[in-house]
Amino acid sequence: IAHVHKIPLILDNTTATAYLFQGLKHGADIVVNSSSKYINGSSNSISGILTYSGRFQWDPEMYPQIAAYKKFGPMAYIARLRNSLFRDTGACLAPMNAYLNLIGMETLGLRMERQCSNALELAQWLEETYPSVTVNYPGLKSNNWYEIAKKQFSRGYGAILTLRVGSKENAFALIDALRIPYTLSNIGDTKTLVIHPGSTISLHSSE
């Protein structure tokens, strides 16, 4: 649909990473990752990554900023980013942050494998043990997206699951009863985290 309207398909692959899902192979033109999450793995660096396929045909009338870099051919978009974004905002990763991310990448495969298997086992246990709780996890056969996830994700279904427990009061009672997880608004950490999004990261969002 995006390409019909001459719009690049941009994918935020932060929660899956390239370990679980390779967006460029599935038709995305641009893939972005908050590398502060799973890629880093220890919550000690703020950074992001952008990967461009080089395949998208930028319409010069719709994207005059890109057209100015047409001499760079398929890499005109990257040239535009490097020339304007770096120059105007200084968006260049600090060496120490890059170093911390590289350390995290060395264990990315191992961490994702373990976190995904743990999430699946927990989701299955919750679904079987507490039928009154709605467990949303793409690795469950009862999930509406299971067949698509099974087709597209070859190494696991991610490390995030959500629960619907009936009310905000029930949600906080559950969080307060937990002993191992930390109550923090982050993902991709080596620690197990739990949060009530409606009261934190989505507090100012509309329904």
Where would I find each of the regions flagged by the language model?
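Conserved PLP-enzyme active-site core in the AAT-like
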Residues: 1-130, 136
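Conserved C-terminal alpha-helix-loop-beta "cap" of PLP-dependent enzymes
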Residues: 131-207
